[in-house]
């Protein structure tokens, strides 16, 4: 996606399109219009057509889009044939939920290992994922693991991020309230569930439908 030089907003929507197109293919549907895509993914048709236009002629006017072609295109664009191996740091309630869920049911992302400091959890498996002590982080992380999920207390998030910066990790999904400072070669996505909930409540009160 980076080589295409497409807008980041478009890049964020590609997995959403891919998931819906997967479902269409499984249902046996052969083609789909931008209006149908719009209704399913809740993105307006003009935005979908603009997103798709960055990749050339993916469809035909009056015909729509060939589902199998779109599926093949997005699988290649999103590197769906390559497994992205992930480490999870912090096996509390949220971290444990991630381990039980994992991601291979829906895409090409797989949590390979987890880290914590709890004696009750270290040395066990949760959801089939081994849990190691945080002291073993640098030793256990292989070059194959390039993404980390942070579900640790906010007070230790920065120190863990600093340690991850010394490994081959290039992406961090941060579920802590802490805003992390890392080198430019590491990309961070912040997901603060409390902020998201507060934002939703604000919109409900101030922008009623």
From Swiss-Prot:
Residues 16-55 bind DNA. Gene3D superfamilies: NAD(P)-binding Rossmann-like Domain, Winged helix-like DNA-binding domain superfamily/Winged helix DNA-binding domain. It is found in: Cytoplasm. SUPFAM superfamilies: NAD(P)-binding Rossmann-fold domains, Winged helix' DNA-binding domain. SMART domains: CoA_binding (SM00881). NAD(+) binds at residues 90-95. GO terms for cellular component: cytoplasm. Keywords: Cytoplasm, DNA-binding, NAD, Repressor, Transcription, Transcription regulation. One of its GO terms (biological process) is negative regulation of DNA-templated transcription. GO terms for molecular function: DNA binding; DNA-binding transcription factor activity. The keyword Nucleus does not apply. InterPro entries: CoA-bd, NAD(P)-bd_dom_sf, Rex_DNA-bd_C_dom, Tscrpt_rep_Rex, WH-like_DNA-bd_sf, WH_DNA-bd_sf. Homodimer. Belongs to the transcriptional regulatory Rex family. Modulates transcription in response to changes in cellular NADH/NAD(+) redox state. This is Redox-sensing transcriptional repressor Rex. It comes from Bacillus cereus (strain AH187).
């Amino acid at each position: 996606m980076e080589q295409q030089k497409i807008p980041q907003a478009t890049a964020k929507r590609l997995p959403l399109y891919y998931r819906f197109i997967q479902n269409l293919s499984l249902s046996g549907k052969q083609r789909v219009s931008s209006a149908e895509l719009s209704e399913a993914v809740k993105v307006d048709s003009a935005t979908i057509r603009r997103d798709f236009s960055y990749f050339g002629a993916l469809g035909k006017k009056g015909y729509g889009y060939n589902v199998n072609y779109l599926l093949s295109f997005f699988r290649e664009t999103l590197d769906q044939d390559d497994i992205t191996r992930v480490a999870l740091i912090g096996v509390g309630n949220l971290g444990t939920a991630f381990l039980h869920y994992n991601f291979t049911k829906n895409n090409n992302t797989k949590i390979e290992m987890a880290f914590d400091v709890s004696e009750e959890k270290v040395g066990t498996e949760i959801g089939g994922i081994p849990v190691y002590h945080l002291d073993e982080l640098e030793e256990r992380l292989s070059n194959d693991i390039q993404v980390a999920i942070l579900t640790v207390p906010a007070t230790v998030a920065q120190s863990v991020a600093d340690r991850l910066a010394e490994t081959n990790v290039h992406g961090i999904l941060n579920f802590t309230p802490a805003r992390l400072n890392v080198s430019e070669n590491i990309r961070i996505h912040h997901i603060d569930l409390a902020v998201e909930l507060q934002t939703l409540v604000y919109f409900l009160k101030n922008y009623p439908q």
